[in-house]
Amino acid sequence: MGEELKTLKRTCMCGGLTEANIGDKITVMGWVQRKRNLGGLVFVDLRDRTGILQIVFGEAINKEAFEKSDSVKSEYCIAAVGTIVKRESPNMEIPTGMVELKGEYIKIFSESETPPIYIKENLDAAENIRLKYRYLDLRRPDMQRIFMLRHKTAKVIRDFLDEQGFLEIETPILGKSTPEGARDYLVPSRNYKGKYYALPQSPQLFKQLLMVSGYDRYFQIAKCFRDEDLRANRQPEFTQVDMEISFVDQEEVMDLNERLIQRVFKQILDVDVKLPIERMTYKTAMDKYGSDKPDLRFGMEINDISEVVKGVDFKVFQNALENGGSVRAIKVTGSAALGRKQLDKLVEFVKTYGASGLIWMAYKKEGIKCSISKFLTEEDTQNILNKMEAAEGDLILIVADKNKVVFESLGALRIHMAKQTGILEGNNDFKFVWITEFPLLSYNEEENRYQAEHHPFVMPMDEDIQYLESNPEKVRAKAYDIVLNGEELGGGSIRIHDTKLQEKMFGAIGISKDTAWNKFGYFLEALKFGPPPHGGLAYGFDRMIMFLAGTDNIKDVIAFPKNQNAFCPLTEAPNSVDKSQLKDLGIEVK
């Protein structure tokens, strides 16, 4: 039976005690990291979320406390009272290593069974075990640092936005289902049988309604939900830093947000982000990097060599160019020595992105080796090398296909080769870039209709509105993403604030006027009552914390995450429910 706290009060945390505290009488509380009995002395390392403090109990100090201390084991929850003294054998690996607590009293609040995982840094344990015993996993110092960092980051963001005149306003969790994009999580209504609420994928329409309501500057650290197949670093529930601003243009939104980014990275990591952050159009990003999320920490840019090879008698090149595609290449410096097996693996790699194949050209000391050498004249080969500015030791990798396939395959290959060659090892740079002028729409061949690239409420660029009905693919959006080291950190846009233009936008993506009013009538109605020009942005807060904490696993930055199957090993959710509960909801499971 554990002891009660009663009148005992904790006076300080473990991790902040130094030589300046020598002579202080203190009370600390926490968990036993380990215990060592050296005969006449018992040493206990006590841990709380701030760090570890060594406590020494001895017969000569207090016999009762000494005897009681010998009964504790790892992860017992205890309190200790005593005096801070200088440590005879300092431990320079911990901040409190110059001092220790001379233990005069001990209270055992609760005992612990042997933990199924070690409470230590850099734990190497199966993920499902960590998630099943998450409350133990969260005791580990590296995990606790992450959640203290997460708290501090949220505070920095709140403080900055408060300084800028923003109001933090909560929007509903139970909302209306609008089946566009990812699947909604649905919540059946007891009062309205056969009808459902939807959990929000974002606060998009509510924050726009707040602009119509005259609140000018809104923000929220919002929980969002998407019932989608989980890829790496996706969770069914996640957190956004969401904001919306009235009477602004795109540059004003971007300017405010890069100042927010600068503040966060300075206060959390002491990293100076130089402003203004580089701007790059979507077209430039795709042409040079094959991605709308380019990693600018290294070069290896994509080059269009279509003009150089248009006269080459090689059917793959000819077919690509005749069908409106292109021939493009990347140069991998110092990789000409790659063996045939490695090159064959690269061929298979690009095929996973839809490419029909990969042509390689290795500039070796003994000459040029090429996978299509029999189709190239010496002049053809030299023209390609000149266009790529290749030198001895370089490897040229070429894809010829439809532009979409070329960009996706070479963009992915560029990242793959950067990892394979190790050029990013030890690179701790933070390379930000704004991507702008996205396509407003893209064509979905499966559904035989256009769909919104971001969402249906994005304002087209002024000069492109005229093409919305006649040539939709030509229309660019007033949209902007902030990208960091090849990952989207956040994204936003200027919004449509005109009912007729919003109806026209719905029409462009195959939503009739009647359907639009049925799904979004409350919003379209609001646009009739003097909506201001407005725009906003949302950050993936979990992803932001991943960057700041230096982890590549989203589960590390969420206290109680789901696994890859959207299942919680800790609570075993989702679970079956009583038939009586289903009956109340008018639901029958067959």
Swiss-Prot record:
Checking Pfam families in the record gives: GAD, tRNA-synt_2, tRNA_anti-codon
Q: Where in the cell is it found?
A: Cytoplasm
**Its domain of life?**
Bacteria
Q: Which GO terms describe its biological process?
A: aspartyl-tRNA aminoacylation
Positions annotated to bind L-aspartate: 180, 226, 454, 495
Indicate the enzyme's highest-level EC class. Answer: ligase
Region Aspartate, as annotated, extends over: 204-207
Q: What is its main location?
A: cytoplasm
Positions binding ATP in this chain are 226-228, 235, 488, 540-543
Gene name, per UniProt, is aspS
What do the Gene Ontology cellular component annotations say?
Answer: cytoplasm
* Keyword Transmembrane annotated: no
Q: Which family does it belong to?
A: Belongs to the class-II aminoacyl-tRNA synthetase family. Type 1 subfamily.
What's the subunit arrangement here? Homodimer.
Q: Which GO terms describe its molecular function?
A: aspartate-tRNA ligase activity; ATP binding; catalytic activity, acting on a protein; nucleic acid binding; transferase activity
Annotated source species: Clostridium kluyveri (strain ATCC 8527 / DSM 555 / NBRC 12016 / NCIMB 10680 / K1)
Please write the reaction equations for the catalytic activity of this protein.
tRNA(Asp) + L-aspartate + ATP = L-aspartyl-tRNA(Asp) + AMP + diphosphate
**What is the protein name for this chain?**
Aspartate--tRNA ligase
The task this protein performs is described as: Catalyzes the attachment of L-aspartate to tRNA(Asp) in a two-step reaction: L-aspartate is first activated by ATP to form Asp-AMP and then transferred to the acceptor end of tRNA(Asp).
